[in-house]
Each structure stands twice: as C-alpha cells, then as structure tokens.
Amino acid sequence: LRKTVLRSLGSAGITLVVLLLLWQAVVSLTGISSFIAKGPLDVWGFLFMSEDAADNRAQMFPLVGQTLADSALGFVVGMAVAVVLAVAFSLFRAIEAGVMPLVLLLRTIPLVSIAPVIILMTGRGTTASVAVIGTIVVVFPALASVLFGLSRASQQSLDVVHVFGGGRLTSLLKVNMPGALPSIFAAARVSVPGAVTGALLAEW
C-alpha cells in the first residue's frame, strides 16, 4: 500500500512538473504578452520574489479561499440536486418525461450566455448566484452518471425484493442506491472541475 501511494504521488508530481514546463515553454516561445498570459515564473515572482510579494499573498490567498468555498457550495448543491432528480426519475417516469427536456435544454445553452441573467436575478457574488450557476454546471454530468448507476441494479436482487413484498421505493433504497454508489462517486469526481468553473464564472 505504501509503495502504491508513493508511486501515485510520484506520478502526480512528475505530471505537475511537466505541465508547468510546458506552460512556461508556451508562454516564452510564443511571445504572448504578459498582460494576456502569465507563466509559472511570473506567478512565482508575483507571490514570492517581488517587493510587494507579502501584500500580494495577503490579497490573493483569501480570494482563493473564497473561490474554493464557492466551488464547494456549487458542487454540494449540484450533486444533491442530481441525486434527488435521479431518484425522482427512477420512481416516477412522468417526472423524467417533464423535467429531462429542461435539463437537456440548459445543457445545450452556453452558460456564459445565461450567467448574466442569473446574476441579475440573484445578485453578483451572492450565495444564490454561486449555488445556481454551480448547480447548472454540475447537475447534468452528475445526473447522467447517477441515472446510469441506478439502472444497472441486479435484476436478481430486485426480484428478491419483489418476492418478499417490497415496492419500488424499497427496491430503490435497498438495491438501486447501494448499487449506484460507484457511479455517484464517479460523478462527484467528474463534477469537481465543473464546480470550480461555475464558481469562477459566478464571481466574474
């Protein structure tokens, strides 16, 4: 186990170094203006080498913390909405027929185009705007994954529940939901980058 952890950390470290080197190479070789794109060396100098480095860190780190908090809020709300919708869709097909087209419609509309409307309705930088935008970003991939997991329940297990008099809700709680846990965790892992993107868009 220790070797596996060390190997994973080593691979992650090497990947990070390679990405930083590629980032710096692209910025340096293409001659992109520093006003448009900063390289890792520019960021390092801004945070640790310049005369105002201490002030820069004091100003930036609280903002990073706020963005992470906003990302967590959008992630939690989006995942919760996705799970609730998936359960409702599994229990009541009429709800799926009525709500799924709206979810697909939100997915096809670029979020950048509707974000200003959401911010006007909920306020710039408010908890509501962060939650709404984060939910829109997170809910579709998470919903698709959770629905897939719920539909993959063992038919034999479902038959056992039905033989003992269990209904759809019992089957959902005792068979479908436990069987969907891997898909829920996979949805959570996939949704994290989307939650960060949603938080940045809501703050912008």
Show which residues each predicted segment covers.
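Alpha-helical membrane-interface segments at transmembrane helix boundaries
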Residues: 6, 61-73, 96, 103-106, ...
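Transmembrane-helix boundary motif in ABC transporter permease subunits
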Residues: 73-103
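Periplasmic/extracellular loop-to-transmembrane helix junction in inner-membrane transport proteins
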Residues: 29-76
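Transmembrane alpha-helical segments of polytopic membrane transport and secretion proteins
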Residues: 1-17
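Short helix-to-coil transition segments within interhelical loops
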Residues: 150-156, 160-180
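Glycine-rich helix-loop "coupling/hinge" segments at transmembrane-helix boundaries
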Residues: 120-121, 149-150, 197-204
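Transmembrane alpha-helices
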Residues: 132-136, 169-202
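Generic hydrophobic transmembrane alpha-helix motif, especially the helices
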Residues: 104-141, 148-149
